[in-house]
């Protein structure tokens, strides 16, 4: 059973818990961290979702991420999820945005890493492949139908700031 802290809309702790799979009460939210990974050489990491996943199975996504566990803030969640889903140990993460959707608060981060590109690991049931793509290929990716739309919306402020939107 996965236990989460409940949050108010403004991101403050509500003092109650939520359980994955159970309805989230009106006025409460759960916290999700997402991480965009860029190598110091300018390439971006894309992870291919397991085809068995119910949502967007088989799609490549420009993220690692997931729900914050009870007692975990967005930053700690991002570091844990990145390590679990890619094997990358982030030094510093930069918060690049906040997005609200239904009963979820998304905190998005950028990880700039100099990791060995061949050391990326896959998480059973989550991902089946990965690839590093150039900045030009990443710009094409975010401006195409290949990028998961809800993920695009969450990264949009950062993508605009970087001049990546055509």
Residue ranges with predicted function:
Residues 85:
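Short alpha-helical functional segments enriched in proximate histidine and acidic residues
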Residues 22-33, 39-80:
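Conserved Nudix-box catalytic region and its N-terminal flanking loop in Nudix hydrolases
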Residues 10, 39-42, 50, 112-117, ...:
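Short loop segments at secondary-structure junctions
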Residues 1-34, 40:
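Acidic, metal-coordinating catalytic segment for phosphate/diphosphate chemistry
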Residues 21, 58, 101-117, 121-166:
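Nudix hydrolase/Nudix homology domain
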Residues 89-97:
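A short coil-to-beta-strand element that immediately follows conserved catalytic motifs
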């Amino acid at each position: 059973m996965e236990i989460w802290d409940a949050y108010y809309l403004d991101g403050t702790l509500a003092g109650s818990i939520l359980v994955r799979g159970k309805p989230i009460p009106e006025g409460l939210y759960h916290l999700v961290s997402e991480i965009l990974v860029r190598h110091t050489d300018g390439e971006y990491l894309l992870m291919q979702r397991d085809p068995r996943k119910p949502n967007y199975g088989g799609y490549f996504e420009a993220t690692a991420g997931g729900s914050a566990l009870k007692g975990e803030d967005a930053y700690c969640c991002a570091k844990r999820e990145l390590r679990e889903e890619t094997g990358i140990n982030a030094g510093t993460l930069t918060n690049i945005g906040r997005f609200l959707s239904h009963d979820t608060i998304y905190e998005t981060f950028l990880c700039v890493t100099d990791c060995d590109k061949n050391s990326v690991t896959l998480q059973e049931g989550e991902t089946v492949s990965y690839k590093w793509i150039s900045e030009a290929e990443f710009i094409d990716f975010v401006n195409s139908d290949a990028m998961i739309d809800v993920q695009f919306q969450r990264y949009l402020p950062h993508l605009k700031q970087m001049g990546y939107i055509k």
